[in-house]
């Protein structure tokens, strides 16, 4: 089978909303409705629970977690409308060691639930989005102790579900209950909407940029049960960007799609309310039109439970998938064409 369950870890007493992986030391962070944030090390075929962060810091569910690139900082966004920043006390981890994460900062500003957070690739900017229909961009220094809001983006008409930065270009994408994805760009230190992607017929829960530098592409998952691939056409210096829907991926889901992830090797994974984990690959042909096919599906990937998120990770030199669901479990998957 192309998809095989490698491990299933029962980590939380309630649904797991978010996961993020720090590849250098193999650190996995999880956020849950039970308000706990857990940090594990996945290395040498073993999993070691390093720390359970103070579950009294957030008063409601932890909806999103994100490691700062090339850093020891972890950010967590909560339904209590705040974002917490954590730092590691011991950066030299030995096998079997424990790790103490210390609270470094609490960021306040949103008027309602924080749904998504994402660090820019250089780690200088943190984007957050909320049920209050806004996207905030925060600037910080190397220490990550202080955060200044440099822009509040309020062009979405409904709840903003997700934000993600491009890994190579200075672009931010936000996905919303208003059925759109908006692309944001920095114009002389002023963040503005460069494009609005329309076409989905329902809430857009998630999006992810491709890891290639050119062309610039984005995949999105929606309430309408589809995954779409969008492509930027034009010059990176254009003020108003033109994006086209390059492809609607073959139908692998029958319900809402809550998570999408684009791998460094070019595969797209999706998960959702129907409990299906799907992987798609792009057909290799001479056509200018992007064509995709389903490479693998796994039904009931979290038994009868909904799946909230999916990530591609590299563990011990091997590309794998991680999913998290309403069952409080985090599942690790082997994938092979």
From Swiss-Prot:
Q: Which GO biological process entries does UniProt record here?
A: iron-sulfur cluster assembly; tRNA wobble uridine modification
Q: Which compartments is it annotated to reside in?
A: Cytoplasm; Nucleus
Annotated WD repeat ranges:
11-50, 57-96, 109-148, 155-194, 199-240, 252-290, 301-337
Per UniProt, what is one Pfam family of this protein? WD40
State the UniProt keywords alphabetically: Cytoplasm, Nucleus, Repeat, WD repeat
- CDD domains referenced in this protein's UniProt entry, alphabetically: WD40 (cd00200)
- Do the record's keywords include Transmembrane helix? no
Oligomeric form and interacting partners: Interacts with NAR1.
Q: Which family does it belong to?
A: Belongs to the WD repeat CIA1 family.
What's the protein called, per UniProt? Probable cytosolic iron-sulfur protein assembly protein 1
- This protein's species is Candida glabrata (strain ATCC 2001 / BCRC 20586 / JCM 3761 / NBRC 0622 / NRRL Y-65 / CBS 138)
């Amino acid at each position: 089978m192309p998809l095989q369950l490698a491990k299933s870890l029962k980590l939380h007493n309630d649904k797991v909303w978010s996961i993020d992986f720090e590849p250098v030391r193999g650190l996995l962070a999880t956020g849950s409705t039970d308000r706990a944030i857990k940090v594990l090390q996945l290395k040498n075929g073993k999993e070691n629970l390093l720390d359970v962060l103070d579950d009294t810091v957030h008063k409601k569910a932890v909806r999103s977690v994100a490691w700062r690139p090339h850093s020891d900082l972890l950010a967590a966004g909560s339904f209590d409308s705040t974002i917490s920043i954590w730092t590691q006390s011991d950066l030299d981890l030995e096998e079997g060691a424990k790790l103490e994460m210390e609270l470094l900062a609490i960021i306040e500003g949103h008027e309602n639930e924080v749904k998504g957070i994402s660090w820019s690739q250089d780690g200088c900017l943190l984007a957050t989005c909320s049920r209050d229909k806004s996207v905030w961009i925060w600037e910080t220094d190397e220490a990550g102790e202080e955060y200044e809001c440099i822009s509040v983006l309020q062009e979405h008409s409904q709840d903003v579900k997700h934000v993600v930065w491009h890994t190579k270009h200075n672009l931010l994408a936000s996905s919303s209950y208003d059925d759109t994805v908006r692309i944001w760009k920095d114009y002389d230190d002023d963040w503005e909407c460069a494009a609005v992607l329309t076409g989905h017929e329902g809430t857009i829960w998630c999006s992810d940029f491709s890891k290639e530098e050119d062309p610039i592409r984005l995949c999105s998952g929606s309430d309408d049960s589809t995954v779409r691939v969008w492509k930027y056409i034009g010059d990176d210096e254009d003020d108003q960007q033109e994006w086209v829907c390059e492809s609607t991926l073959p139908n692998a889901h029958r319900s809402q799609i809550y998570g999408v992830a684009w791998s460094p090797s070019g595969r797209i994974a999706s998960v959702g309310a129907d409990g299906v984990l799907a992987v798609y690959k792009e057909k290799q042909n001479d056509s200018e039109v992007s064509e995709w096919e389903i490479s693998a599906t796994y039904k009931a990937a979290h038994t009868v439970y909904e799946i909230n998120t999916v990530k591609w990770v590299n563990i011990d030199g091997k590309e794998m998938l991680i999913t998290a669901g309403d069952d409080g479990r985090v599942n690790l998957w082997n994938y092979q064409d």
